C-alpha cells in the first residue's frame, strides 16, 4: 500500500462503535478530513482544489460551535474511494491560502461533527496555540484571553 494513502494512527475519540468497526469504515471510506485550513478559506476554494482528484459528493465546512464561522477544517466526501486516494496522494501536504493542508481518512461524516470541539467553540488545537497565526484567528484562545480578557465571548 502507498504510504500516502495509509490509515494514520489518529482515531476520532467520539466515534460510536468499536475500534475494529472504525478501522473497517476508514479502509472503505471515501470521506477525508482536511485540517490546518485558514479561517478565510472558502467552500468554493475547497471545491476548486479537491475536484482535481475526482467528483465531489459534498464539502462540509468546519464551523465554530457558537459563532457558526469557519474554524480551520472541513470534510470532503468523494463519490469514489479511488478519488479520495488520489487526493491523499497528490493534495495532502500542499498549500492552500499559504497554509500546508493536512488530509486524513474519516470514517464518514455524521451531523454535528462540523462543529469545533474546543471549549470556546473552535478547534481544540487553536485553544492552546501560543504563536500568532493570522490565518487562524490570531493568537490561541487561552493566550488571547490573557492578553485581553474580553476577547472570549460566546
Curated annotation (Swiss-Prot):
Chief localisation class: nucleus
Cited CDD domains: RRM_NCBP2 (cd12240)
A Gene Ontology biological process term: mRNA cis splicing, via spliceosome
A cellular component term, taken from the record's GO annotations: nucleus
Superkingdom in the source lineage: Eukaryota
Alphabetized SUPFAM superfamilies for the sequence: RNA-binding domain, RBD
Stated name of the protein: Nuclear cap-binding protein subunit 2
Amino acid at each position: 500500500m502507498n504510504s500516502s494513502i495509509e490509515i494514520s494512527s489518529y482515531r476520532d475519540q467520539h466515534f460510536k462503535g468499536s475500534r475494529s468497526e472504525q478501522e473497517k469504515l476508514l479502509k472503505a471510506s471515501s470521506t477525508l478530513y482536511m485540517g490546518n485550513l485558514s479561517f478565510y478559506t472558502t467552500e468554493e476554494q475547497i471545491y476548486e482544489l479537491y475536484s482535481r482528484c475526482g467528483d465531489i459528493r459534498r464539502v462540509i465546512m468546519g464551523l465554530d460551535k457558537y459563532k457558526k464561522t469557519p474554524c480551520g477544517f472541513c470534510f470532503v466526501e468523494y463519490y469514489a474511494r479511488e478519488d479520495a486516494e488520489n487526493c491523499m496522494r497528490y493534495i495532502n501536504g500542499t498549500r492552500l491560502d499559504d497554509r500546508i493542508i493536512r488530509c486524513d481518512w474519516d470514517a464518514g461524516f455524521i451531523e454535528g461533527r462540523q462543529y469545533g470541539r474546543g471549549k470556546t467553540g473552535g478547534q481544540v488545537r487553536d485553544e492552546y496555540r501560543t504563536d500568532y497565526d493570522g490565518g487562524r484567528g490570531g493568537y490561541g484562545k487561552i493566550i488571547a484571553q490573557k492578553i485581553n480578557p474580553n476577547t472570549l465571548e460566546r
